[in-house]
Structure formats: C-alpha cells, structure tokens
Amino acid sequence: MDRKYDFKSIEAKWQAYWENKQLFKVEEDPEKPKYYNLEMFPYPSGHLHMGHVRNYAIGDVVARFKSMNGFNVLHPMGWDAFGLPAENAAIKNAIHPATWTYSNIENMKRQLKTMGISYDWDRELATCKPDYYKFTQWMFLKLYENKLAYKKKSAVNWCPSCQTVLANEQVVDGACERCEAVIEKKQLEQWFFKITDYAQRLLDDLALLPGWPEKVKTMQKNWIGRSEGCEFSLHIEDSDEVLTVFTTRPDTVFGVTYMVLAPEHPLVEKICHPEQEKEVKAFVNKMKYLNEMARTSTEAEKEGVFTGAYAINPMDGSRIPIWIANYVLMDYGTGAIMAVPAHDQRDFEFARKYDIPVKVVIKGEDTPLDGNLLQESYPGDGHMVNSGNFDGLTVEEGQKAVIKFMEEKGIGQGTVNYRLRDWLISRQRYWGAPIPIVYCPECGPVAVPEEELPLYLPEDIDFKPYAESPLKHLERFYKTTCPSCGKEALRETDTMDTFVCSSWYFDRFCSPHESKQPFSREAVDYWMPVDQYIGGVEHAILHLMYARFFTKFLFDINVLSCQEPFTRLLTQGMVLKDNAKMSKSKGNVVSPEEIIDTYGADTARLFILFASPPERDLEWSEQGVEGAFRFLNRVWRLVSELAEGIKDLPAAEHFPELDSEAKNLRFKTHATIKKVTEDIGERFNFNTAISAIMELSNTLGAYKGIKKPNWPVVKEAVDNLLILLSPFSPHICEELWQLTGHAESIYLQKWPKYDPEALLQEEIEIVLQISGKVRDRIMVPVDAGREELEKIALDNPKIRELTRGKEIVKLIVVPGKLVNVVAK
C-alpha cells in the first residue's frame, strides 16, 4: 500500500477526534485507581517555547501510559495569568492587561492542542478570572483569621524598574529575578504570610518525599536554614535598652570582643553617642543603597562604624563595644551578633581591620593562646580556655553547659533559629488578586466578609507608569464603607503576589467549576495529592515551598486530607541551542510552531523525548529532528506495507510450532514490551524506551522480507509496536492502528504485558559487521561462545564474499550482540 505520511492531515484528524469523543475527560471513579499527573501551569506569555514542549511532552507520555495501564488519569491544564508582564504590556502598547492575557491564552491553547497533549480541557482555569481569585482571596481571609496573615512596616526589596516590592526569594544575587535591576531597600507597610510558623514541619516532612530529587530537597532544607543555639540578652551601659542576640556557638561567649548591629536595627538610633552620630548616620545611609549580596559576600570588604555604646557581657561583666557593620542583616536572627574574631573568619577580618582585640577561647591542637598570633580564625573543635569555670570542657560539652547556666540565671535560653523569613505578599501593582482588607478609622483593619467575595479587580482603569499601585488613583475602588461599623473606610490597594495564586491551583483542578467553595472535599479526597508533578528546578524554593505551606495550612483547617501536595517530582532539564539556554537576546530560539509545521507534532515530541533523559539538559539538533522524522516515515511505510496481511486477523493467544525467525520476532516484541514498560513506569528513561522501539521496528522490517512470514506473529509485533510508540507519537499510531483494522482508539487499549515464555530463547539474532558497517543479521544459538561466533562469522557467505582478497586484522566479538570483522 503506497500511502504518503501526510502528518498535517493525520494530526488534525486525530486532534479533532479526541476532542469530539472527549477521550481525556475524567470524573472521580472509586472503582479505579486514580493517577493525578500535572505539569506546572505556564504564564500566558503568548507563545510556547521548546522548554514548554519538553515539559508537556514528558507529562503526556506519563498520562497516556498510566491511562493505558488502567488508571483513572487526571491531566489538566490552566494559566498562571496574573503578573507584571501583562501590566507592562498595557503601559507600553495601550492595551488592557486582561485583553493581552486572554489573547495570549487563546494562542497558547491553540498551540498546545497542535501538540496532541491529552488534557482534560473542561478543567481549564485561569488565575485572573474572578471565579478563581475569589478563592485566592478566601485563602487570604482564612490565613488572616488564623493569625497567619499580618501587616507590618518592614525594610523591603524594592525593584525600581518593576516599581514593586519583591519577596526575598525573588531577589537573585541582589537583583530582581525578572528584570535584573539592582534592588533597593525601602521601609514600607506590607502584608506577610507567617510561613515561619511552619518552618519545622516544612523541614521535617521533606523526609516524607522519597519521590523528590535530593537536589531539590537540599535546596529547600538550606533555604529553611535551621540552626540550633541560644538567644541571650545583654544590657547596654548607661541605658535601659537591652540587646538580644542569637548564637550557634554559646561555647565562645567568653571570646566576644565586640557586638555588631545591622545598620537597620532600631537600637542604632537610640544608643548612638552624639560624637559618633554623624559617622553612624552616613554609614546607615550608605547601606540603604547596597543589596544583600554586596554586603554579605565573602569577597566583600567588611566595613563598619563604632556607635560609642557598650554592652555588658552577662557571663563575665566585661564591656563590649557595639559597632554597626555591612555584613550583618536585620532580617536574619535578631539583627545583632556577638562577634568572636578568634573563632569566626568574618569577625576576624573585621577585628584586624579596626584593631579590635582577638581573644582565644577554644584551644585546638595548634591554636596559640595569644589572639595576636592568629593568622586566621579557628572555627574548629577543641577545649574551652579563658572561659572561667567552663575551662577544659569540649565544644559540645561547653555549648550545653553555657545554655544551662544562662537558663538557670535567666540570662538566655536554648533556641532554634531559621533562615526562612515570613512571606511578603504585598505588590504595588494592578494586575493581581486584590487583598480583601478595609481600613477603618474606628475599627482598624477589617476583613471583607466571605459572602462579599470576590472583591473584583476593576476593569476600566487608566494605565500609566505610576510609582505606586494604579488602584490608589481609582476612588471608586479604594473608597468604601467599613464592613463592621458602616463608616467611611479605605480599601487596601496592594494586590497579592502571583505565587499566592499558584500555591493552590492543583487543588482547584480537582473541581474547577465549584462556585461556593475553593474545591469539593469529595473531589480533593479522591484526587489529591498530585502523583506526579513536572516542572523546572528553578521553582525548587519559591513555588514548591509555598505550595507545601498552603497544603499544610489547608490540612490544619480541615479542608484537605493530605499534608504534602506532590508525591513525586520530576525537574526536567533546559533545552539548549549552541550550548546556551534559548533566548531572544542570544538569537538561538527555535519556534515549536515552525518545527510542528515542518515535521509534525509527533516528530517534535519524539525528538525531544529521545535526545536526552528528562532530568538533563537537552541540546537542540536539527539533524536529530530529521532523524526522528525519518524514523516515523519508516514506521509509516513498514506498517502500511504489512497492513493488508494483518488487518483481518484476530489477535492470536497461542503461537505453536514457530520457526527460528518467528521465535526471534516474538522474543524481540516481548523484550521490547518489558523494556519500555520498565523505562516509562519505573525510571522515566524515555530515550532508552524509544531506542528499544526503534530496534523492534528494525527487527520487524528485517522479518518482513522473508518468504513465508507468520502473520499472527507479525500482527502481534505490529500491534505492540504501535501501542508502545503511542505515548510518544500518538497521532501516527492512531492512524496506523486504524489502518491495521482496529475500530477503537489506540488510547483506549490496555498496555501490553510481556510473555515470559517468549523471552526463553534457543537462538538469538546477532549483527555481522565488516569494519563497523552492518553486513548481515543472523540467528545463532543463545549459548554460542566467542570461538563459535568467530567461526560462524567467518563462514558466513556475505562476509566471505566481502572480505575476499583482504587481510583480516582482528575479530571483535560482543556475545549476544555482534561480531565485527576488521579487514583491510
């Protein structure tokens, strides 16, 4: 049968078929095991890039595989649709953010459909729609009700380019994660979520996630940053003020020779002596314009100013000078440290620069007792010295003894500190979920009642590059009445960080049309947690941490039954071109639309899944795409040619009296079933699964040429070849499945199970090569040894003919695989 592989009409045909038949639509079914498969939903930028294609192709293989294995598969898609780019586009192009966003969604949805992804589009959601952000606001109210949402004045990260506040996690190397502008510090009233209340649970429960990459768990562990130590107070000389510090090394408290406050510390102004005031103010001012990275980098020069004030060491009564310095930050610990230059390198460098004494209190093997003789700090183990009654104790013993002494004397207490800070969620922008709070002169901050949600984001608004939220300029939005007393009041004009919207969207997918509550309890109890989550490692801290926090909170208020949102996590690598991440600025972007138009979605999917294991970076290769296209063309020709011989045959259950060639084809078929099943189901080794399918195709192609093929064996091989290939390249497999006499969609077929009997071999096929080029394929006894294989190869008619008159230099034998005759 001579039919051309017309991928365009084939792909359009089957995409329409799937949609019309609603093949991917699912409901809860207690009779079937569920499988919730989710790729991180995208920001609707308007165009898919190759990273999207890879992410969604990986997810689709898993979804199709699980469905064919009898699971009730939930595979939804939606849009993380609030955010700054829409607002910037509005200002730049005089177009409303909603118009820009919905237009982008339509285009990206069309592109996704051309990829043939098995999404249940009935569950589509967009976080910018009122029926969604109504419940984002509900989440805020619940957090507020439970004392986990609060407002305070804080030194915040301000992006002068985006004109908004950023969370700590959105600042990378002192710059805005999105636009790379250097951030500034500003004092602003901001809303926070108290994620720190969950720090220990977020840390402990990483142990419940064996299906997560260790790298991601380590990143979260480091971000939470648990440290054990003690917190104690020091009185300030000639003042009623008290200074509180946290230290992980209470054993070194006798070695404190100066204290350091962060320049932003509220005590700086109160304790500064008049003669130091000018210098201190100048230094504080200078620090306002330095980002955290520049201040705390190990390469950064340590700078500071003496305040003129002294603290009293509660352990020995010594006077300790109080400095301010660039390397101490207000938002870590208490914003104050005890400096022990003999045993901390940063303190040591600072002390040497400003001629501050260095006192040794931990003696290692070669540590001099005289601090003046130290060339660098000694942070290691040893025994306490110069420490009064604690002399002679080991570091570990000393830490316990000092904490015990402090607790008995009421000086301090053992405590745990975390690097994790509360989540700053206020954004001074328009295109986000409005914060449902009203400020009343009589009642103070008042929550908008639940029955009044959603608090709508006004659509008709003037877009200008304001230095504050545009909502502040819209009287009909911010002027309101107090829900409590009815008097005139003002609305909060900040909107929520978009990460709030994405911290619970996976719950909403379980029942996206629910109008009275965020999700149906019955639905989330059936579907949650997500069984497989797929997305980039760049979300390891931000999104994944926030999603875990929300899930634990929703469990605590008894609306969810699970405490972790994602059972397994796959972080796929990037798609590179010329060894660099694809980007417009580098001019190395490959358009998925062009690739699909030229080669088809099946080819694009096959290449991107074959070129590299999913967790590794993938180098784009035009030759690789062409190779995938050639393979699909070969499959098309092969199955088309075999179709007439098998389309009217029933599937055989028994295969008696097979000759060696038929046995070998059955062996290859069932070995491939076993390999592909394990590679997809256990390891996500899609590249090796595809390689095995290619080998089966080659074996089938070779078998096709024999005089009297066993058609039931051929049918079994063809049917399984198509089923195994269908999660990777579904359109061509649907078409060939139909062509070979099947009425029902290949998607509805059961995944095959291998026959152990077929894997018991008397003979196996090996390749015969001459100088690395394949010249023949032959059947040999399964237990043939090296010498026997050498003899078989040299006696082979093709090998003898092609090596006549040549010198055979050596024979390379790989038992069970090949014999390579090297001749010259």
Curated annotation (Swiss-Prot):
Keyword annotations from UniProtKB, A to Z: Aminoacyl-tRNA synthetase, ATP-binding, Cytoplasm, Ligase, Nucleotide-binding, Protein biosynthesis
Main location, first listed in the record: cytoplasm
Motif 'HIGH' region, residue numbers: 42-52
Localization (cell): Cytoplasm
EC number from the UniProt entry: 6.1.1.4
Pfam families: Anticodon_1, tRNA-synt_1, tRNA-synt_1_2, tRNA-synt_1g
Gene3D superfamilies in the record: 3.10.20.590, HUPs, Isoleucyl-tRNA Synthetase, Domain 1
Residues engaged in binding ATP: K584
GO biological process, one term: leucyl-tRNA aminoacylation
GO molecular function, one term: ATP binding
Cellular component terms per the entry's GO annotation: cytosol
Renumbered ranges of motif 'KMSKS' region: 581-585
Known catalytic reactions: tRNA(Leu) + L-leucine + ATP = L-leucyl-tRNA(Leu) + AMP + diphosphate
PANTHER family, A to Z: LEUCINE--TRNA LIGASE, MITOCHONDRIAL, LEUCYL-TRNA SYNTHETASE
Family: Belongs to the class-I aminoacyl-tRNA synthetase family.
Name assigned to this protein: Leucine--tRNA ligase
Organism of origin: Syntrophomonas wolfei subsp. wolfei (strain DSM 2245B / Goettingen)
Gene: leuS
